[in-house]
Amino acid sequence: MARSPGDRCALLLLVQLLAVVCLDFGNGLHLEVFSPRNEGKPFPKHTHLVRQKRAWITAPVALREGEDLSRKNPIAKIHSDLAEEKGIKITYKYTGKGITEPPFGIFVFDRNTGELNITSILDREETPYFLLTGYALDSRGNNLEKPLELRIKVLDINDNEPVFTQEVFVGSIEELSAAHTLVMKITATDADDPETLNAKVSYRIVSQEPANSHMFYLNKDTGEIYTTSFTLDREEHSSYSLTVEARDGNGQITDKPVQQAQVQIRILDVNDNIPVVENKMYEGTVEENQVNVEVMRIKVTDADEVGSDNWLANFTFASGNEGGYFHIETDTQTNEGIVTLVKEVDYEEMKKLDLSIIVTNKAAFHKSILSKYKATPIPITVKVKNVVEGIHFKSSVVSFRASEAMDRSSLSRSIGNFQVFDEDTGQAAKVTYVKVQDTDNWVSVDSVTSEIKLVKIPDFESRYVQNGTYTAKVVAISKEHPQKTITGTIVITVEDVNDNCPVLVDSVRSVCEDEPYVNVTAEDLDGAQNSAPFSFSIIDQPPGTAQKWKITHQESTSVLLQQSERKRGRSEIPFLISDSQGFSCPERQVLQLTVCECLKGGGCVAAQYDNYVGLGPAAIALMILALLLLLLVPLLLLICHCGGGAKGFTPIPGTIEMLHPWNNEGAPPEDKVVPSLLVADHAESSAVRGGVGGAMLKEGMMKGSSSASVTKGQHELSEVDGRWEEHRSLLTAGATHHVRTAGTIAANEAVRTRATGSSRDMSGARGAVAVNEEFLRSYFTEKAASYNGEDDLHMAKDCLLVYSQEDTASLRGSVGCCSFIEGELDDLFLDDLGLKFKTLAEVCLGRKIDLDVDIEQRQKPVREASVSAASGSHYEQAVTSSESAYSSNTGFPAPKPLHEVHTEKVTQEIVTESSVSSRQSQKVVPPPDPVASGNIIVTETSYAKGSAVPPSTVLLAPRQPQSLIVTERVYAPTSTLVDQHYANEEKVLVTERVIQPNGGIPKPLEVTQHLKDAQYVMVRERESILAPSSGVQPTLAMPSVAAGGQNVTVTERILTPASTLQSSYQIPSETSITARNTVLSSVGSIGPLPNLDLEESDRPNSTITTSSTRVTKHSTMQHSYS
């Protein structure tokens, strides 16, 4: 049914009216806000409800901060219509800030009435807005109505003062800045509502330091600081300090406290000052030929900030340094200009250099002084100091050209020289030229003239030629002192000749049949002008080769080769290859090409299966022959004779045990048999005593060894088998002599000879077990000292005794109890040194050796009794030491008599002595009848002779039993026998032992002819005969030792000179070895020793071949004659 427009308007009005009625009288939760002005009367109900997004919300409630609002409670109330309509018990509840959220305790509400009360003073700066939610709940806590929101706004009051964000503000501005230039901005904040005037801040400058004039002003609203003028000068004031304050509102002065802050403004430096040089001109001095030396320093002052670019000076050369001799830089610490010589100057070329510099700053000048600055050069004069110069090359590199086509006749020609000149005179210097680098030895340089010649034809293709040049270096060494050197370089440019033809790089190739092309490459060792590009052509030999293969593409040094028909097999393709000059090799270049089937990703299949290796006929035949030889070896062993002695030399088992392996360079082999020589406990058991025949060696085991000792001054160095030993010698420089000794050394045996306390180890297989010399010396010294201490407890039996009628008592104990002389050392081990030594002796002699001969061989050391001094607390003794040893192949003349001796003060000295000349502060008495027993030790020695040798030479040959006569005489002159050279000295005791083989009678001792008849002389003589076990003749005439040989007389003498002998007496050296411990306490010299003319046997061509020693001790009491 259609309606008219009037009807539609009436219906719309009716709907609106119904809605208003529902709003006013329908069910719902209502909020009443009480107006503070109406004292508890609520606001009109409909003016505080606003429709928004289909929900009813209340308008905010405004409460002022800082006031007591408790008198205005309740400030709001919520109510539900269901309480009246249905009579339901309703409970009201609020949540939100101030109640259930911090800050707590601001609001409280009544659960029954829904009234909201305020309990605290509000602070907008703490909580500017409160949002509360109200609920209407039934008894079960369920919402009866939709929750209602309540907004409470806190109104601001001006209760806060402005506060600066910093206590100190820092800013900066360049000096000479224009007026009204912004310097910085300061900031202060106010906690009041920024949308009100309560938060407005006003700024003001309170004071300025320094306060000479106001340089800055402050915008009171924005806090910006500006300059007042352009007169800021850092050199005057480098910084300013401002005190500023901030106030509320427009800056009215009130009673409220005012916040202040400090502002520090630093004035930045600009380059508004020109650097000033200290002096107007400078002078310096440098030595020629020096480099990197400081010439001078130029000091500059600048008023700008120290250390900045505006202060640092910048130096530039205006003139005079076109040669680049000098360099100038700035010292950043002192702002000085350092002028340095960086290139050598020559006094002969320039004696003075004039320079000029300009000084600026590192930073550009400020615009305020650009018009004032004018560059002014600073003159500098540098004088060159002349020095004595060395040598130099005019050019350190000299170049020559040489062709590899030159002939050999041109090698002797000079290609140039490399002359060195004296830098002072400019003339050629006197130097020596030496090559230091000539890798392939191409050139020779004359050491005097520096002339350069080629010694080899240059080869361009040599691996030492780089880029067509060969380099050598020459050093010139000056002849003056100190020597100076200079190095020059010789560069030889080699001219290439087309003497090499292009050849194939790889003449044997294998390609797969599916490859369309074959790359063929050639090379030529000549230079670029005589090598590539190459020309390739295929030679049609055999005919048809050129049609089968063709060249499809050619590069400079290679071509691509293509086969007309794909066919497997091997082909030889001859090429004619020529270089850029048309030169080719006379022989054809043949490419051996194999076309084969290839696996995918692999090589030729045929090549992979051709690796089979099998045994050929020759290998099989060799294996069969080897088996036959193995079968033949047992048959050959049956033919060999077992157990038969070999003819000729007897094999020596275990040669490493007996013979020294001279072909080994290492240490001697380990000794496996410890010699019994070191087993004895006493001092005498560690050495073999002996003179000429002191070393008892087995027949056939002698090996001659020569040793020479040189005695000069007061030391003696002896070389024995390449080893030097030092011995003390009391000879003066005038009495220096050479004593040559020849000893006997057993091969591969260590024979230790104890000679006057010194120990010698002869090289041999037993050298590894030799005891240390220092250990032996210390051991025997302590041993002798212990026996010396024991002597005080025993009565002396074997020395000159001191009686009551003599002047002084003995200061030293007697050595009468010399039990250690008879030690456990037994030399019988030398009789049989074992089967190995016997076999070696048989090999060397070529005959059998019988060891059944019973030979007595003993040796006990002979010790000399020490005599106490007559007075004083020291024991004086003058000793002359010499030694004579003998070799089987070397003869030396006997030592000459000594005419002068010298004594020196030593302590605990161990010497080797042969002749002993002693001076003792004690009266010596002549001995009694020789028949009576006395303190006498007689050494009886027998010798057998061998081949003829010169006099004073003894050969220690194989031992033969024989008879000897030993004669011992003792002469003791009385105290009246005074010699003119020894008028102030004491007595002399002369002892002589004469040892003779059969056939020689000792001659009488001719000493009495030199003594005056009026003096008393006591002579004691004793003869003993030593004979082998077979017996000897009762007479002294015994048969000769060896047929056809001559007899040998060996005389051993011990002489003790004193003042009673005449100066004409000569004492020869005695050949003996004695162990003594000598202590000297005074230094003096005596005259020539007396010559007693004791006759020695001088029969030539005699040799001692066997020695036997027996030591017998006799006791004799000696008396004094008045």
Curated annotation (Swiss-Prot):
Signal peptide span per the entry? 1-28
> What's the protein's topology in the membrane?
Single-pass type I membrane protein
Residues that make up the propeptide are: 29-54
SMART domains in alphabetical order:
CA
Positions of region (Disordered): 913-932, 1089-1122
**UniProtKB keywords:** Calcium, Cell adhesion, Cell junction, Cell membrane, Cleavage on pair of basic residues, Cytoplasm, Glycoprotein, Lipoprotein, Membrane, Metal-binding, Palmitate, Phosphoprotein, Repeat, Signal, Transmembrane, Transmembrane helix
Q: Which GO terms describe its biological process?
A: bundle of His cell-Purkinje myocyte adhesion involved in cell communication; desmosome organization; homophilic cell adhesion via plasma membrane adhesion molecules; maternal process involved in female pregnancy; mesenchymal to epithelial transition; negative regulation of apoptotic process; negative regulation of endothelial cell differentiation; negative regulation of epithelial to mesenchymal transition
Positions with biased composition (Low complexity): 914-924
Query: Would the keyword Secreted turn up in this protein's UniProt record?
Result: no
Picking any one GO molecular function of the record gives: cell adhesion molecule binding
Name the phenotypic consequences of knocking out this gene: Homozygous knockout mice are embryonically lethal and heterozygous mice also show reduced viability due to failure of implantation and arrest of embryonic stem cell population expansion. Loss of Dsp localization to cell borders in 3.5 dpc blastocysts and a decrease in Pkp2 expression in embryonic stem cells. Conditional knockout in kidney tubular epithelial cells results in an increase in injury markers, apoptosis and inflammatory infiltrates in response to induced-injury, ultimately leading to an increase in atrophic distal kidney tubules.
Report the SS bond pairs: none
Q: Which residues are glycosylated?
A: N117, N314, N467, N519
Q: How is it modified after translation?
A: Palmitoylated by ZDHHC5 at the plasma membrane.
**Extracellular domain ranges by topology:** 55-618
Q: Which residues lie on this side of the membrane: Cytoplasmic?
A: 640-1122
Q: Which GO terms describe its cellular component?
A: apical plasma membrane; cell surface; cytoplasm; desmosome; intercalated disc; intracellular membrane-bounded organelle; lateral plasma membrane
Q: Write out the biased-composition intervals (Polar residues).
A: 1100-1122
Provide the function of this protein.
A component of desmosome cell-cell junctions which are required for positive regulation of cellular adhesion. Involved in the interaction of plaque proteins and intermediate filaments mediating cell-cell adhesion. Required for proliferation and viability of embryonic stem cells in the blastocyst, thereby crucial for progression of post-implantation embryonic development.
Q: Which PANTHER family does the UniProt entry name for this protein?
A: DESMOGLEIN FAMILY MEMBER (PTHR24025), DESMOGLEIN-2 (PTHR24025:SF1)
Subunit annotation: Interacts with PKP2. Interacts with CTNNB1; the interaction promotes localization of CTNNB1 at cell junctions thus reducing its nuclear localization and subsequent transcription of CTNNB1/TCF-target genes.
Q: What is this protein called?
A: Desmoglein-2
Q: Which organism is it from?
A: Mus musculus
